Amino acid sequence: MIIGIGSDLIDIRRVAEVIERHGDRFLNRIFTEAERAKAERRAKNEKMVVATYAKRFAAKEACSKALGTGIRHGVWWRDMGVVNLPGGRPTMQLTGGAAERLKALTPAGHDARIDLSITDDWPLAQAFVIISAVSLATS
């Protein structure tokens, strides 16, 4: 059963402006170490670096909406990180207040699953998050 849906659309140029203005202070406040490492591996192409950050920013916004909190009520930027599953599919890894909120949303006898779709087409980046409760009972 679906327990949360969130989406976000962001102008990649806005993210570029914020990075230009605030640099590491912004990057350290918003992104996990794994997210920063992924973006910096694309350092040969500045547009790809910024698009990578923008997609992850949009994913965090979408996830916070799916959690029903936004970026408040104990859910902070670095509590949510985009990671890739072994096959390459992106998902969200939650810690801290975001993980606590997810646990509170998940009904007893269920596990939470977070599905994430991220994309970019200059100058826009988009993310869509669906949080589902999957029954632990076997068929």
From Swiss-Prot:
Catalysed reaction equations from the record: apo-[ACP] + CoA = holo-[ACP] + adenosine 3',5'-bisphosphate + H(+)
Keywords from the named record: Cytoplasm, Fatty acid biosynthesis, Fatty acid metabolism, Lipid biosynthesis, Lipid metabolism, Magnesium, Metal-binding, Transferase
Subcellular location: Cytoplasm
Top-rank taxon: Bacteria
Listed GO MF terms: holo-[acyl-carrier-protein] synthase activity; magnesium ion binding
The keyword Lipid metabolism is annotated on this UniProt entry: yes
Pfam families membership: ACPS
InterPro entries documented for this protein: 4-PPantetheinyl_Trfase_dom, 4-PPantetheinyl_Trfase_dom_sf, ACPS, Ppantetheine-prot_Trfase_dom
Main location: cytoplasm
Cofactors, names only: Mg(2+)
Binding site for Mg(2+): 8, 61
EC number: 2.7.8.7
Entry GO terms, CC: cytoplasm
Transmembrane segments: none
GO biological processes: fatty acid biosynthetic process
Family: Belongs to the P-Pant transferase superfamily. AcpS family.
Job of this protein: Transfers the 4'-phosphopantetheine moiety from coenzyme A to a Ser of acyl-carrier-protein.
NCBIfam families in the cross-refs: acpS (TIGR00516), pantethn_trn (TIGR00556)
Name used for this protein in its record: Holo-[acyl-carrier-protein] synthase
Organism this protein belongs to: Bradyrhizobium sp. (strain BTAi1 / ATCC BAA-1182)
Source species taxonomy: Bacteria, Pseudomonadati, Pseudomonadota, Alphaproteobacteria, Hyphomicrobiales
Gene of this entry: acpS
